[in-house]
């Protein structure tokens, strides 16, 4: 028998997944008695619930319950493969502690901040919630209301949220947990190209000659895409892989150029590579002259800490951290000329030979390069700079917007791209890259939404970390969290978030499927439907929009986040939320409910129930009397059509395994900005970065600046946080899957064995991890998948019994406001 390399890789992937979950694999599976048909399982397509890869899965339903899933052979993304988490999707909805009814803190029969959680009806839950929101609106106005959403929201849910908050409550205090993972990437796209999202796609994996991973452990965090990297590398001897990280991990095992650098010095390495390209005469001057302009970024931009923090006061000299000034190629070359091989090697701790080999991957005009990055770059106090500096390398060499030449920002959540970014649930955004600060774009949104001009406020709201601080300070008093475990995920959560949640002036609502750390800190818990318990749509990292039908009912009284927002809107009239001057100028809106204004507005409600799939239920549509999801999608789509964000008609998505936008004349776009590949590029332009008015991309000159909190004599160890293969984010789903729990039941403090020996710790010893903000206990791990350099420890954050974010620093990139979870100083002490 012969076996192809691809089949071998598939078998290896299945074996790794099985071993991770302690599942024995038989050499030959037994036949099903009576054949597969006898199982009477109905199969339907859906995208995976977990990361932003967007794998297609087939979901098996029997007797109203999801009983099995498997990789979708027709899905281009994963071609039938799943990672170990994907194999257990059928179990994520059936944890023993699934929430099935609203829970309100009560004492003596009434709501009390210090009361016990008590089951209540949806009517009482919403009545209490509405009364609290109206109290805050009356006493402090709309800026005291906030909502924290998610890159796991469906496109419909995110769109409903941005309408409810901006057009309904007139508050821009809406932000997603994607602030913690993708904000730096989004800002860098906008600052460089004038449009968000990657220009390439997953097809680049089969065309590239080199893969450079910047702060990305793809083998564990994007394992299905990693199989495509491995297939390309192992099947083509000329292909090279470089992996840059602050410690050695599973992705490093495939690396031809394994690089471990000192935390924060990736900025210097990036400037060294740019200098190498210039000094060796490999700049593509024709491309640079025709398609780019140069700018210099503001420096001394601080660390996004509170204004009175001494570190912030010492580091911040720039008035506007996001400011840029026109520059030239010569000025750029002068700045990067300081980053010599010897200087950067000493600063970063990387061997000169590895740095030279890395630089040559980019400099070689005959080698196509795919750069890949995720949290190591984005969770960085200079994350926007880091993203833009990678674009510098691709723009200097012209290696961009064509098969195999691709700077590619990987995404961590299922719809961080499709919902958080494209729908516009960040504090400053509207759909399709529009912003609330632009009066023309606000007016565009108001016309599409059929609301009066002037309703949408122009001031950006509070970002994620600022929301925690405002809750703590008592200036944000009504707060609704959906589809995320924010308290476990927040940096410095003991110092900022926890006191804010329990501030007696604040009312906290959490919509979730399980009693998470965040839910248990709330005042009201609303039970939420999950994944295929609702009709949904996600947008993945390659701009692919994928839609699925509702396949099963949610348990008990659980309801989707979309239903919750729409139903909540029925409890408010415009008189209660809009100012008198708007109502006086538009008297026909006076007295209308927010539901009528936002959802039963002649646009969202224009598709009746006859358009529903007769086989699959749609809870929201049946509740409100019209096809809710189709109406929301078709109202949202015009934001992007004709503007480079074109979506296909909604019904089309039910027939395909996703389409990559822009979808023009029924055809998806794989590579953007290149003539012949992108319909928006004008004939004769060759390459056109049409997001910017001049059609050119920006190359930015910025220096290396050090992290906010380096180790010192007392706190002498770098702490890095992150994830592991078996668990996803805070573990609220995966820790309830028995096989995944057994595979990795608790977080560990990964440590260099020599550091452990010097400190007197044996393998498995319990230790205290202490920072200036807080401490936790964990156990030392000196073996296994993560091999730490001296002076660095790694702790994953999935374990609710080890809240490592008690320890982390709430520093953010001052441009993107994204949190740096990768660099703070700790000490390791015995228990």
UniProtKB/Swiss-Prot annotation:
Question: What InterPro entries does the database record attribute to this sequence?
Answer: Asp_de-COase-like_dom_sf (IPR009010), CT_Nitrate-R-NapA-like (IPR041957), MoPterin_dinucl-bd_dom (IPR006657), Mopterin_OxRdtase (IPR006656), Mopterin_OxRdtase_4Fe-4S_dom (IPR006963), MopterinOxRdtase_cofactor_BS (IPR027467), Periplasm_NO3_reductase_lsu (IPR010051), Prok_molybdopt-oxidoreductase (IPR050123)
Q: Which cofactor does it need?
A: [4Fe-4S] cluster; Mo-bis(molybdopterin guanine dinucleotide)
The question of whether 4Fe-4S is a record keyword is answered with: yes
Q: Which domain of life is it from?
A: Bacteria
Q: Provide the primary localization.
A: periplasm
What keywords does the record list, in alphabetical order?
4Fe-4S, Electron transport, Iron, Iron-sulfur, Metal-binding, Molybdenum, Nitrate assimilation, Oxidoreductase, Periplasm, Signal, Transport
Gene3D superfamilies membership: 2.40.40.20, 3.30.200.210, 3.40.50.740, Dimethylsulfoxide Reductase, domain 2
Which GO biological process categories is it annotated with? Answer: cellular respiration; Mo-molybdopterin cofactor biosynthetic process; nitrate assimilation
Modifications after synthesis and translation: Predicted to be exported by the Tat system. The position of the signal peptide cleavage has not been experimentally proven.
Please tell me one Gene Ontology term that the record gives under cellular component. Answer: membrane
Chemical reaction(s) catalysed = 2 Fe(II)-[cytochrome] + nitrate + 2 H(+) = 2 Fe(III)-[cytochrome] + nitrite + H2O
Q: How is the cofactor bound?
A: Binds 1 [4Fe-4S] cluster.
Query: Key word ATP-binding present in the record?
Result: no
Where is this protein found?
A: Periplasm
Q: Where is the signal peptide?
A: 1-31
Q: Where does Mo-bis(molybdopterin guanine dinucleotide) bind?
A: 85, 152, 177, 181, 214-221, 245-249, 264-266, 375, 379, 485, 511-512, 534, 561, 721-730, 805, 822
- Supply one GO molecular-function term: molybdopterin cofactor binding
What residues does [4Fe-4S] cluster bind to? 48, 51, 55, 83
**NCBIfam families listed in its UniProt record:** NAPA, PRK13532.1, TAT_signal_seq
Q: How does it assemble?
A: Component of the periplasmic nitrate reductase NapAB complex composed of NapA and NapB.
What is the stated purpose of this protein? Catalytic subunit of the periplasmic nitrate reductase complex NapAB. Receives electrons from NapB and catalyzes the reduction of nitrate to nitrite.
Q: Could you tell me what this protein is called? A: Periplasmic nitrate reductase
The gene it comes from is napA
């Amino acid at each position: 028998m012969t076996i192809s390399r691809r089949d071998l890789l598939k078998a290896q992937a299945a074996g790794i997944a099985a071993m991770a979950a302690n599942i024995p694999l038989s050499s030959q599976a037994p036949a099903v008695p009576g054949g597969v048909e006898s199982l009477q399982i109905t199969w339907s397509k859906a995208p995976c619930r977990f990361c932003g890869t967007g794998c297609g899965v087939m979901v098996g339903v029997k007797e109203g319950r999801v009983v099995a899933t498997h990789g979708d052979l027709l899905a281009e993304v994963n071609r039938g493969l799943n990672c170990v988490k994907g194999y257990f999707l059928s179990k994520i909805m059936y944890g023993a502690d699934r929430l099935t009814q609203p829970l309100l803190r009560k004492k003596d029969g009434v709501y009390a901040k210090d009361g016990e959680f008590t089951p209540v009806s949806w009517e009482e839950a919403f009545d209490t919630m509405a009364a609290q929101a109206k109290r805050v609106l009356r006493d402090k106005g709309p800026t005291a209301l906030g909502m924290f959403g998610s890159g796991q929201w469906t496109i419909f849910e995110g769109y409903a949220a941005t309408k409810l908050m901006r057009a309904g409550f007139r508050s821009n205090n809406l932000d997603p947990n994607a602030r913690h993972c993708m904000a730096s990437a989004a800002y860098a796209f906008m600052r460089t190209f004038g449009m968000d999202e990657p220009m390439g796609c997953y097809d680049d994996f089969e065309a590239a000659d080199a893969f450079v991973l910047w702060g990305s452990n793809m083998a564990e965090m994007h394992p299905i895409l990693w199989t495509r990297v491995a297939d390309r590398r192992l099947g083509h001897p000329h292909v090279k892989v470089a992996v840059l990280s602050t410690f050695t991990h599973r992705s490093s095992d495939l690396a031809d150029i394994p690089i471990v650098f000192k935390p924060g010095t990736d900025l210097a390495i990036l400037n060294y590579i740019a200098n190498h390209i210039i000094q060796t005469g490999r700049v593509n001057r024709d491309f640079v002259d025709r398609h780019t302009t140069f700018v210099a970024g503001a420096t001394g931009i601080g660390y996004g800490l509170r204004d009175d923090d001494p570190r912030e006061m010492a580091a911040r000299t720039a008035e506007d951290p996001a400011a840029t000034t026109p520059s030239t190629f010569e000025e750029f070359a002068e700045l990067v000329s300081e980053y010599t091989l010897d200087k950067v090697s000493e600063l970063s701790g990387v061997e000169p030979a590895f740095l030279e080999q890395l630089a040559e991957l980019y400099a070689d005009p005959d080698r196509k390069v795919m750069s890949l990055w995720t949290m190591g770059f984005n969770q960085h106090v200079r994350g926007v700079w880091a993203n833009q500096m990678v674009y510098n390398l691709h723009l200097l060499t012209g290696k961009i917007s064509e098969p195999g030449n691709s700077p590619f920002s990987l995404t961590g959540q299922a719809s961080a791209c499709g919902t958080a970014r494209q729908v516009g649930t960040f504090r400053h955004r509207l759909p399709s890259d529009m912003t609330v600060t632009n009066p023309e774009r606000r007016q565009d949104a108001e016309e599409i939404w059929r609301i009066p001009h002037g309703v949408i406020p122009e001031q950006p709201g509070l970002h994620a970390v600022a929301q925690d601080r405002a809750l703590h300070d008592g200036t944000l008093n009504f707060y609704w969290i959906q589809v995320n475990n924010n308290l476990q995920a927040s940096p410095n959560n003991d110092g900022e978030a926890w006191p804010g949640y329990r501030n007696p002036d604040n009312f906290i609502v959490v919509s979730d499927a399980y009693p998470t750390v965040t839910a248990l800190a709330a005042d009201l818990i609303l039970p939420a439907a999950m994944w295929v318990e609702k009709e949904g749509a996600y947008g993945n990292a390659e701009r692919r929009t994928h839609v699925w039908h509702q396949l099963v009912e949610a348990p008990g009284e659980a309801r989707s986040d979309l239903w919750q927002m729409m139903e909540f809107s029925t409890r408010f009239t415009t008189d209660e939320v809009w100012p008198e001057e708007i109502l006086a100028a538009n008297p026909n809106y006076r007295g209308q409910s927010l539901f009528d204004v936002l959802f039963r507005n002649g646009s969202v409600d224009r598709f009746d129930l006859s358009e529903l799939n007769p086989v699959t239920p749609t809870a929201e549509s049946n509740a409100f009397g019209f096809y809710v999801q189709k109406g929301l999608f078709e109202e949202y789509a015009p934001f992007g059509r004709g503007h480079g964000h074109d979506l296909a008609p909604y019904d089309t998505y039910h027939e395909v395994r996703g389409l990559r936008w822009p979808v023009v004349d029924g055809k998806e776009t794989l590579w953007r900005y290149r003539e012949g590949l992108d319909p928006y590029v004008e004939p004769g332009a060759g390459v056109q970065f049409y997001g910017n008015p001049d059609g050119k991309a920006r190359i930015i000159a910025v220096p290396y600046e050090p992290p906010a909190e380096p180790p010192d004599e007392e706190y002498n160890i770098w702490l890095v946080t992150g994830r592991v293969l078996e668990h996803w984010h805070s573990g609220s789903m995966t820790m309830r899957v028995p096989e995944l729990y057994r595979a990795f039941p608790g977080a560990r403090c990964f440590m260099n064995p020599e550091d452990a020996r010097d400190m007197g710790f044996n393998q498995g010893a319990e230790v205290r991890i202490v920072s200036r903000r807080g401490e936790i206990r964990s156990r030392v791990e000196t073996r296994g998948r993560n091999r730490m350099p001296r002076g660095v420890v790694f702790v994953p954050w999935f374990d609710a019994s080890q809240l490592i974010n008690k320890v982390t620093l709430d520093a953010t990139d001052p441009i993107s406001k994204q949190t740096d979870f990768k660099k703070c100083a700790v000490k390791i002490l015995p228990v």
